[in-house]
Amino acid sequence: AILGTLSGENNKLLMLGNPTKTSGVFYDSHTVDRALYKCHTVNSENVARVNKKNIENLKKKYGKDSNVVRVRVYGEFPTQEDDVFIPLSIIEQCSSKLYELPDNNKLPYIILGVDIARFGNDETIIYRNAQGRLKIMAERKGQDLMATAGDVIRIYKKTINEFPEYRGKIYVNIDDTGLGGGVTDRLKEVKKEQQLYRLAVVPINAAEKIETDTKAGKEAAEYYNDLTTHMWACLKELIEHKEIEVEDDADTVAQLSTRKYRIASNGKIEIEGKDEMKKRGLKSPDRGDAAALS
């Protein structure tokens, strides 16, 4: 519609933006319609006031040819791979830097998503989904399980004070595979000891098949090969419909936008495993998993 206002002799159109999407008028102005526009690309490497150390960290972490570096450093449009599960463009549109979830569109629950580190370089991450607003509440490396349980209890109590109008349960969806079982057991003990009746501990084995004892479970099991894929699909759907606001955290955005998927031999969608991502030189998607758990 805006192009229709340019019929006047001296009318001009100025567009400024981050090149996150590979569609739309802004993308066309730099590609198929480039002859109609005078395009300027700002490369952060050539800007004096930009912290060059941050640029090098991004390159080291995600690779100089990654979409994260292309968009956030070079000012270039992403070369979106067909097998990436959640496109960078839709994640950016829900970033708290650009988007604020309307108060009348809040989700009716508060959930803590807890992803427990498996190895020394992995992170233990606690994400809080407070009625649709996702925020990192704790990030730890090399922390023992009891300290992680203490983090969860502290965040639970903090959340009750921050949201006095919310009277429902506060769910803790915790990665119960491997080391996570110890945190689950301790949380159940503390809940009983301190009579934390609004604390609902939900152990999740993300590697398991989807339970089919409900209608929703049966429908999900027709499309997704395991619980991890289903959780990420739910997160993707919320992002696509702008039903959540995701904290503007570079690591979270990168992890969400680089995880791939495939069609398994049974015809169902299956998301890339953590070990497969590490073989590609990527970090374990701890933040992405915690966000999906929440």
Task: Name each region found by the language model.
Residues 1, 125, 147-155, 289:
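Well-ordered alpha-helical segments embedded in enzymatic catalytic cores
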Residues 1-65, 183-203:
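ASCE P-loop NTPase helicase motor core
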Residues 5-17, 123-132, 176:
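A short alpha/beta connector and helix-capping loop motif
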Residues 22-25, 130-268:
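Mg2+-dependent endonuclease catalytic cores in nucleic-acid-processing enzymes, primarily RNase H-like
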Residues 113-114, 247-294:
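Charge-patterned, long linear interaction tracts outside catalytic cores
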